[in-house]
Amino acid sequence: MTDVEGYQPKSKGKIFPDMGESFFSSDEDSPATDAEIDENYDDNRETSEGRGERDTGAMVTGLKKPRKKTKSSRHTAADSSMNQMDAKDKALLQDTNSDIPADFVPDSVSGMFRSHDFSYLRLRPDHASRPLWISPSDGRIILESFSPLAEQAQDFLVTIAEPISRPSHIHEYKITAYSLYAAVSVGLETDDIISVLDRLSKVPVAESIINFIKGATISYGKVKLVIKHNRYFVETTQADILQMLLNDSVIGPLRIDSDHQVQPPEDVLQQQLQQTAGKPATNVNPNDVEAVFSAVIGGDNEREEEDDDIDAVHSFEIANESVEVVKKRCQEIDYPVLEEYDFRNDHRNPDLDIDLKPSTQIRPYQEKSLSKMFGNGRARSGIIVLPCGAGKTLVGITAACTIKKSVIVLCTSSVSVMQWRQQFLQWCTLQPENCAVFTSDNKEMFQTESGLVVSTYSMVANTRNRSHDSQKVMDFLTGREWGFIILDEVHVVPAAMFRRVVSTIAAHAKLGLTATLVREDDKIGDLNFLIGPKLYEANWMELSQKGHIANVQCAEVWCPMTAEFYQEYLRETARKRMLLYIMNPTKFQACQFLIQYHERRGDKIIVFSDNVYALQEYALKMGKPFIYGSTPQQERMNILQNFQYNDQINTIFLSKVGDTSIDLPEATCLIQISSHYGSRRQEAQRLGRILRAKRRNDEGFNAFFYSLVSKDTQEMYYSTKRQAFLVDQGYAFKVITHLHGMENIPNLAYASPRERRELLQEVLLKNEEAAGIEVGDDADNSVGRGSNGHKRFKSKAVRGEGSLSGLAGGEDMAYMEYSTNKNKELKEHHPLIRKMYYKNLKK
């Protein structure tokens, strides 16, 4: 295997089964969809603003205004990356008035829609056979997924636009500057993009969209970032662009003196004339849509001109620590930096003896994602997004086998490091002595000229004093050129503590892998200049329908708060409220019922809780094993092995340490009793724990995902926000308001008022620290860590709110006084006598 382009594909249900009306019956109407909420909210907003008397959300019957807030967070990486490009996009798209015909007469309702009134757009006579519509104002694309041309159109749109929402029948995309950069990087020409959009659109493509596409693609590829002898150089073939960069107030001062001098413009122009003389232009025939489709689907249209075969004639050097600043500034001035690696012609770095084993098979979607990265003998830096359980690791391994240079892999935890090493040895011919591991427990280096190193973000990003062995390995990593770097769970890279690893390690090609390209801090757009554009994003529903991942039934179970708990909930502080709705007795009973129900079906069940106190209480009450951050490694392995291979252990409780670091393909049911507020990423990562089910290809099989939510609490708002990412991927959450038969199960927990009052008293006695969320032990969670990636140690004294009962020993604490003199006397006695003395003292 020499290139991904040479691959040949090996091969080219019902989501909600009938489980009985008694089980999934609902006493209330289904909740309104996001579209209905937005529509009702917009209809009433103007009226409410005129009166200024009450909240607009209250005018929508049965809806709360916090649901409206989910609209801003429901969109994925596309909207996050667009936030930084708003000014540029608006400048290119603002001139939409030129698209309105002169003879257009607004009707009586045009004023209600204002800028969203597109009644002036004229449908084409054959619009029924065309699958998409493009908004002239913001570049949003609506695709009919039931159209005969939908499959080809999806492959095209994923290349040129960002997927926003992809439910069953209607998909939404958005054209952004970054998505167009990615399209040009895989070989598409500007005219080809406009031509195909025009042929697929129900209405003529607006002039504003055409100008936006031309403006975003005209400057791509004119500035390159290359690595020579472990030094970074900015290169360009045009003298005016070089002069502009050097005169820039940000980039100019970052230039450092080197022996690479800029050639005179006359020489540059003469070389350009010699290079381009006699070369025919190669454009895809606009009349041949199939040719353009094949060019997009294939990933590269094999351009005849080899304009990159010779070295750039203009260059200047920048320092390693300035790489991020320069790349970001180039994005801002509309000259995005191109990072391509001509690995076939790189004879300076030694080759790595690595190939896929003959038994290794690449799935079609994995091959398609790799074709976006490789083309024309070059490797492009960028990001590939695949759902959990879809084989992201194998994609990275295949890319490493294609480049055949030294590889470094960065993961989020030491557990992931060992998994990556094991996967490399399983799927390819790499020898164990060429595969090194760099963690807190293992500090290895390969002894040959080239090899593989697997490490964590925390180990590389650490800025504290290192041990001798650790510093020796770090010098080894930073003192050489790497052909390829794989960034697992790449969504953690924008964090302040980890983004420095991108420039610390000098790598020619970068590949970011993730299932959830979302962050709650809107820093996901930084990946466009830290790593590169998004090269490919798979459709979760499509992979599920083809059997590559499991079909999942998602449900939100509403658990009413008992009267005693809700009364205390209304009067307590925010942190104590969290503990009350997590320890809701009705939620406990629902969890117990679902565990018993699915154990009878033969399912393997995982129960997730971010709150350690609740995790222990639930698990001990039900007699189930549990794992959290303080669980010893050996005990973890024993519990996981029994869960996988012991028929008597069918349920385990996990804290957030199981979100990403634990691979349990046997799990078929997941129950979530507490979570990390409104984190969309965590919701998708937890769903991924059951997407790897081994029986996913069995007819009629489904995996089950339950989110238990205490009704009429803040948890309902967080739950709606968390589901936004999965809803955009096409998943539907069924609302269950009552579990029939729950009251009749034997040994129902907290069935009597007395038991519920005792539980409430125990919860109220707990201090607010018990309501906290466990800090993860991996790089995927930056909470509780310092700027260098190390865990923050608790201080001896913590300032916080308290009560007089706590000072008086009323929080389940006892006061004990010891006599120092008596203790000294007891030291001279036999240990048995000392034990009897202390025993009597406690009585």
Curated annotation (Swiss-Prot):
Coiled coil: none annotated. It is an enzyme of class 5 (isomerase). Residues 26-41 have a biased composition (Acidic residues). The keyword DNA damage applies. InterPro entries: ATP-dep_DNA_Helicase (IPR050615), ERCC3_RAD25_C (IPR032438), Helicase/UvrB_N (IPR006935), Helicase_ATP-bd (IPR014001), Helicase_C-like (IPR001650), P-loop_NTPase (IPR027417), XPB/Ssl2 (IPR001161), XPB/Ssl2_N (IPR032830). ATP binds at L386, P387, C388, G389, A390, G391, K392, T393. It is found in: Nucleus. Residues 1-85 are annotated as: Disordered. Keywords: ATP-binding, DNA damage, DNA repair, DNA-binding, Helicase, Hydrolase, Isomerase, Nucleotide-binding, Nucleus, Phosphoprotein, Transcription, Transcription regulation. Residues 589-743 form the Helicase C-terminal domain. Residues 373-535 form the Helicase ATP-binding domain. Its EC number is 5.6.2.4. It comes from the Eukaryota. GO terms for cellular component: cytosol; nucleotide-excision repair factor 3 complex; nucleus; transcription factor TFIIH core complex; transcription factor TFIIH holo complex; transcription preinitiation complex. A motif (Nuclear localization signal) lies at residues 64-75. The modification Phosphoserine is found at S752. Disruption phenotype: Essential, it cannot be deleted; epistasis studies suggest it is involved in damaged DNA excision repair. It holds the Pfam family Helicase_C_3. SMART domains: DEXDc, HELICc. Belongs to the helicase family. RAD25/XPB subfamily. ATP-dependent DNA translocase. Component of the general transcription and DNA repair factor IIH (TFIIH) core complex. When complexed to CDK-activating kinase (CAK), involved in RNA transcription by RNA polymerase II. May have 3'-5' helicase activity alone, the TFIIH core however has no 3'-5' helicase activity. Also involved in transcription-coupled nucleotide excision repair (NER) of damaged DNA. In NER, TFIIH acts by opening DNA around the lesion to allow the excision of the damaged oligonucleotide and its replacement by a new DNA fragment. Component of the 7-subunit TFIIH core complex composed of XPB/SSL2, XPD/RAD3, SSL1, TFB1, TFB2, TFB4 and TFB5, which is active in NER. The core complex associates with the 3-subunit CTD-kinase module TFIIK composed of CCL1, KIN28 and TFB3 to form the 10-subunit holoenzyme (holo-TFIIH) active in transcription. An additionnal subunit, TFB6, plays a role in the dissociation of the SSL2 helicase from TFIIH after transcription initiation. Interacts directly with TFB6. Present with 825 molecules/cell in log phase SD medium. PANTHER family: GENERAL TRANSCRIPTION AND DNA REPAIR FACTOR IIH HELICASE SUBUNIT XPB, RAD25/XP-B DNA REPAIR HELICASE. This is General transcription and DNA repair factor IIH helicase/translocase subunit XPB/SSL2. It comes from Saccharomyces cerevisiae (strain ATCC 204508 / S288c).
